[in-house]
């Protein structure tokens, strides 16, 4: 590809992009289309380079996985924070293209939550807030990838809102399970949470 072609594709610094593509397995032929389709092609390309430095095998494998590659590029170009999060531990990348399952099941399982006789969830002894945090972000990566690769984001928005609301609800439930384990292991203390549903709660 030429710098002019990359500029037309959306890269603000096409000469730098051209040199970066030479560092990626498969080069521009494998990556340009998916990166240029992201919200910020330059950011996505730089993040792809960093991901390759962190885990060359992962990026090399994406050359032969077009669907996964498209989703990874969309996330890298759509959110610098999520990109940094994946680059810090490339094993997290699999959440971008694999369905993690229902939010409630994933987050409660992350803290080993079980129900008391009264129906309240209580976390397992060894569970930590970090386990919950990792599960939350695993689901969030999947939601973000679906949203960022949708051909009709407007039509998908209600579903994304519902999934985010379910994720927040599951996070609260799992967080409460951690708290109950330490202060109310029998789940006998009655209380309520009142929250505003400004962003799609249901």
Features from the language model and the residues they span:
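Non-catalytic regulatory/linker segments of enzymes
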Residues: 1-202
């Amino acid at each position: 590809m030429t710098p002019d072609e990359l500029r037309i594709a959306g890269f603000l610094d096409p000469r730098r992009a051209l040199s970066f593509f030479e560092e990626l397995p498969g080069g521009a032929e494998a990556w340009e289309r998916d990166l240029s389709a992201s919200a910020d092609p330059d950011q996505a390309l730089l993040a792809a380079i960093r991901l390759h430095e962190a885990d060359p095998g992962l990026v090399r494998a994406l050359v032969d996985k077009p669907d996964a590659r498209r989703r990874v590029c969309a996330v890298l170009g759509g959110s610098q924070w999520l990109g940094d999060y994946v680059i810090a531990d490339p094993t997290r990348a699999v959440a971008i293209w694999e369905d993690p399952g229902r939010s409630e099941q994933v987050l409660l399982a992350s803290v080993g939550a079980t129900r008391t006789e009264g129906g309240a969830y209580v976390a397992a002894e060894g569970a930590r807030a970090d386990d919950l945090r990792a599960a939350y972000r695993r689901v969030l990566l999947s939601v973000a990838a679906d949203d960022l690769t949708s051909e009709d984001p407007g039509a998908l928005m209600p579903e994304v809102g519902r999934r985010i609301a379910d994720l927040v609800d599951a996070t609260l439930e799992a967080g409460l399970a951690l708290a109950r384990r330490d202060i109310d292991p029998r789940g006998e203390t009655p209380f309520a949470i009142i929250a505003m549903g400004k962003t799609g709660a249901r």
